[in-house]
């Protein structure tokens, strides 16, 4: 992002902080395609395309403003016979420009804010994905109740555009963004459907992720602000909200609506034992307190979404469960707190009595059924978990095929080595190993047995099972590291930067 700062500062001197002129800068599209937007292990980075040039962008934006609205609608086919251009191609070009331009000022605001000690201190509880796993081990054994929350959607993008206007003051840019969303992303309907959101996310992934993450960030900032500053709303720290219209009005309405459901008024409260974790479109709210307070937080979320973001959310979408009786899914794991009961014989003078001791242990389990479903979707096995060949990769060399399977197996192995029981993980490794062998046999037009006997690839494929033990034997001393400990202990790898494609498939 350093080059973003250089280019934007150059544009600032000429255009006075306006984003609209950046749409016509060709280097914006060069920067957009110089980064790897898709982290999928199956998709290669295509690089910068010459079709995304400044001249084409100018022509397309001019054509957008000059087209006849009586002829074109959002439900037209991708190729309009009157204007003779492909709407999907047009949408992709402008979408990349929007995404990269909107990200620049927010990155600069974040980098400038982090230079101030007060801002850093206020965000000291913000952590990366690496801190989630130690948090589960250290904190969850002391908590009693957990609320499984799915962030509501679809949200109309008009609301997102209005929220963006509080942060960026550029009327022409948002006029163009709104026009684009309504006429080329099928957002003409009053209530967007999940199908339209899915189509928009696939055709414009970077812009969709930015808008969605911005919506989540906005909702979390308001939620944390209300939680931390509930008794002293008008503080200096409120300046981070800039000029958010009707914030106090909606906040008062939120309290008013909430107080009608109870015989007495209970204002916003602080719960020192509450913990909040979010990943993708799901969040976990855990607390040590009684279910009554968790139920309070449940309705706070619902009214916040309905009153501030105009998103309808049903109370049944938020479940409150006891940790010792129910498991919850987060980051591709099934987690629960198990109660271990043990009896200890105690003797005092001549009296002997039994004492029952209850201890809590966190169980983190690999979700074998969703993983097999994901592998079946990726054509590594069938729905029953039986390995099959992947003929799509048969055109590659043997080394590339084995390297691809090993990379997938290594990523899944690193991700799920924090589980308490690894039998399910070994089953996934077995599916990938046999699928790799069948793919190689299919390429050489032979059976699995004949291929292994002829090529002697059996030793090479043992890497699917021996790699983890060899690495850990180099890290830990021989006397302390045993295979039994490796099977039982949870090991979190710090190279987990993102969830794999085969994780959290629903």
From Swiss-Prot:
One of its GO terms (cellular component) is chloroplast. GO terms for biological process: mRNA processing; RNA splicing; tRNA processing. It comes from the Eukaryota. Keywords: Chloroplast, mRNA processing, Plastid, RNA-binding, tRNA processing. It is found in: Plastid, Chloroplast. Belongs to the intron maturase 2 family. MatK subfamily. Usually encoded in the trnK tRNA gene intron. Probably assists in splicing its own and other chloroplast group II introns. HAMAP family: MatK. This is Maturase K. It comes from Trifolium willdenovii. The lineage of its organism: Eukaryota, Viridiplantae, Streptophyta, Embryophyta, Tracheophyta. The gene is matK.
């Amino acid at each position: 992002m350093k080059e973003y700062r250089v280019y934007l500062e150059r544009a600032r001197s000429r255009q006075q902080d306006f984003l609209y002129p950046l749409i016509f800068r060709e280097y914006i599209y060069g920067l957009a395609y110089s980064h790897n937007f898709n982290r999928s292990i199956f998709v290669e980075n295509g690089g910068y395309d010459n079709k995304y040039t400044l001249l084409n962008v100018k022509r397309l934006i001019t054509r957008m403003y000059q087209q006849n609205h009586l002829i074109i609608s959002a439900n037209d086919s991708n190729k309009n016979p009157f204007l003779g251009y492909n709407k999907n191609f047009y949408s992709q070009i402008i979408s990349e420009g929007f995404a990269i331009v909107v990200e620049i000022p927010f990155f600069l605001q974040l980098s400038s804010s982090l230079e101030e000690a007060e801002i850093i201190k206020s965000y000291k509880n913000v952590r990366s994905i690496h801190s989630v796993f130690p948090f589960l081990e250290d904190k969850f054994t002391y908590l009693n109740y957990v609320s499984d929350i799915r962030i509501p959607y679809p949200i109309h993008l008009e609301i997102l555009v209005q929220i963006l206007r509080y942060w960026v003051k550029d009327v022409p840019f948002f006029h163009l963004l709104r026009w684009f969303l309504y006429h080329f992303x099928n957002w003409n309907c009053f209530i967007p459907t999940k199908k339209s959101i899915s189509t928009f996310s696939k055709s414009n992934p970077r812009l969709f992720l930015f808008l969605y993450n911005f919506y989540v960030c906005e909702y979390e900032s308001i939620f944390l602000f209300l939680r931390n500053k509930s008794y002293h709303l008008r503080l200096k720290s409120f300046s981070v909200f800039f000029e958010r219209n009707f914030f106090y009005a909606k906040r008062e309405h939120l309290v008013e609506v909430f107080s009608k459901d109870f015989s007495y008024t209970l204002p916003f409260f602080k719960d020192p034992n509450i913990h909040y974790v979010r990943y993708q479109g799901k969040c976990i709210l855990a607390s040590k307190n009684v279910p009554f307070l968790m139920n309070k937080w449940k309705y706070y979320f619902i009214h916040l979404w309905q009153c501030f973001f105009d998103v309808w959310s049903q109370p049944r979408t938020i479940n409150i469960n006891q940790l010792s009786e129910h498991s919850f899914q987060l980051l591709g794991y099934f987690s629960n707190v198990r109660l271990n009961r043990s009896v200890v014989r105690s003797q005092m003078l001549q009296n002997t009595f039994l004492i029952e001791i209850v201890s809590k242990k966190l169980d983190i389990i690999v979700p074998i059924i969703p993983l097999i479903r994901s592998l079946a979707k990726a054509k590594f096995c069938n729905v029953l978990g039986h390995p099959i060949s992947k003929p799509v990769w048969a055109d590659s060399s043997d080394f590339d095929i084995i390297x691809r399977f090993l990379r997938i197996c290594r990523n899944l192995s690193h991700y799920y080595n924090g589980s308490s029981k690894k039998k399910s993980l070994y089953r996934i490794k077995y599916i990938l190993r046999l699928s790799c062998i069948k793919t190689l046999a299919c390429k050489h037009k032979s059976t699995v047995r004949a291929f292994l006997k002829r090529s002697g690839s059996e030793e090479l494929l043992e890497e699917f099972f021996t790699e983890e033990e060899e690495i850990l034997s180099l890290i830990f001393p021989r006397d302390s590291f045993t295979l039994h400990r490796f099977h039982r202990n949870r090991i979190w790898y710090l190279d987990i930067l993102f969830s794999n494609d085969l994780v959290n498939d629903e």
